[in-house]
Amino acid sequence: LADWLAKYGCSDVCMESSGKYWIPVFNILEKTCWVTLAHPKYTKPQKGNKTDRKDAKWICDLYMCGMVKPSFIPPSDIRQLRDLMRYRTKLTNMLTSEKNRVQNCLTVSNLKLDDVFSDVFGKSSRSIIQYILEHPGEQFNVTPFLDRRCKRSIEEVQAAVDGAISREQAAKLKECLLHIDQ
C-alpha cells in the first residue's frame, strides 16, 4: 500500500478509525505519509445509499476542505508502552479474579483462613490449603504449618480449618491455585 501511494505521489492519507482495523494500516503508512485519523462521528456521510467508495470520496472531500478534525495518535513508542500497560492490567485483573475464586472456594467449604491470616496466599496459609487438598476430610494439627510470627493462636487457626471441602470445590481450588502460581 505504501509503495502504491508513493508511486502516485500521495503524501497525505485520511482514514476513518473503525475498531482496531486502522492500526496496521496506520503503522505502515506513518513512515511515508502524513496520516490523519478521523473519528467516524465527524465524518458521517449524507443520507442515501452508502457504499465504501462513496464513504471514501466523502472523507476525501472533507479532508481536502479542511473539515476533518484529526484524532491524536501518540508516537509509536508510547503506543507500544500503552499496549504493554493494558496487557499488564489485564493480567493483574485475571490474578485478582483467580484469588477471589480461591477465597470463594474456601468460604463455601467453611474454611475461614481469611479470619486468621492477613494474607490467605502467604506461606502458612498456602501450606495448610495444600495439605487440605492432598488429604481431604482428614483432621490434622496446624502447628507444623504455622510460622512463629503468626499473630493468631493455634486454637484459632485450628478452628478456622474445621470445614469440609467437596471434590468439586477441591478441583476448582487446585485449578485456581495452579493459575495463580503460573
Predicted regions and their residues:
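A detector of single, family-specific signature residues
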Residues: 1-182
